[in-house]
């Protein structure tokens, strides 16, 4: 016969939420760092279109 599940404790719930929030904060920090790198012009790890290239494509 089926028996009801035990309730998850508040400590376990808080521990899981803290882990999730820590991961989200880490990813947000990475995204912010990458954005700053792109805006400062120091990034050379990937290619993205610049305004000069976009204007040149329209004339062709």
From Swiss-Prot:
Protein name listed in UniProt: Large ribosomal subunit protein bL32
Q: Which Pfam families match?
A: Ribosomal_L32p
Biological process per Gene Ontology, one example term: translation
Q: Is Chloroplast among the key words of this record?
A: no
Quick one: signal sequence residues? none
Protein species of origin: Microcystis aeruginosa (strain NIES-843 / IAM M-2473)
Q: Region labeled Disordered — which residues?
A: 1-60
- In which residue ranges is the amino acid composition biased (Basic residues)? 1-23
Q: Would the keyword Ribosomal protein be found if you checked this record's keyword annotation? A: yes
Q: Which domain of life is it from?
A: Bacteria
Checking InterPro entries in the record gives: Ribosomal_bL32, Ribosomal_bL32_plant/cyanobact, Ribosomal_zn-bd
Kindly state which keywords UniProt assigns to this record, in alphabetical order.
Ribonucleoprotein, Ribosomal protein
Q: Which NCBIfam families match?
A: rpmF_bact
Q: Name one GO cellular component term.
A: large ribosomal subunit
């Amino acid at each position: 016969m089926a028996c009801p599940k035990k309730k998850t404790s508040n400590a376990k719930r808080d521990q899981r939420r803290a882990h999730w929030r820590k991961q989200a904060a880490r990813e947000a920090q990475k995204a912010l760092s990458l954005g700053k790198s792109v805006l400062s012009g120091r990034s050379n790890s990937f290619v993205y279109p610049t305004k000069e290239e976009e204007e040149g494509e329209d004339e062709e």
